[in-house]
Amino acid sequence: MKTRHNFNKDLRMDLACSDYFRPVFSYIHFKDGCAYACDTHILVKNKLSECSTFTEEEIEKLDGKFIGSKAYKSILSYDMVQVTDMGFECILYDNQKVIYPFSEVYKYPEMENVISEHLKESTEGITKLRIDPSFFSKIEKALFNFEYAYMQLSEGNKSLLVKSKDSDSIGIIMLKSI
C-alpha cells in the first residue's frame, strides 16, 4: 500500500481561489496552522493538521507562506511531498524532485477578520436568498469534511456560513441581494 504525505487528495482548495481579475485571490495562504482560500465569492479555512499528513514542523514552515492555485493543483497529484524553507518539494517515483516555490504576495486580506465578522448568527427573518449554485460545488470540494457540514446565515444575512461538525473547517458563501 502506498503511503501518501501531502494534502488530502480530494481537497480542491484551488477551486476557491481562482479569480483571474483579482490576482491576489488566486493564492492559498497558510497562517497559524490553517490554509485559507478565497475568490471574493467563497472563502474556505481548513486546519492543516486535519486536511494533510504534514508534520507539525512542516506546518510551522508554511506559516505566512503562499502558493498559487495552479501550483497547489499540481502538488495534489504527488504522493510524497515535503515542505521545505523554499516551498513544496515533490518526490517522483525515480527519486527525482520537483519544487514548487512559495509565492510572494504583498497585500493579502486578513481572512480571520472576515471570518469573525461573518460568524455572528442571523437574528433577522429572511424570505429570499440568491446563491450561485456553482458555489456549492466549489465549496464541497474545497472544504475539508464537507459531508458533515451544516449551514447558517450570518448576522444581517450577508453570507451563508458552512461549518463542519467534526473539524475546524469553515466556509463562507457571500450572498447576492435580490
Where are these regions (language model features)?
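DNA polymerase processivity clamps
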Residues: 1-178
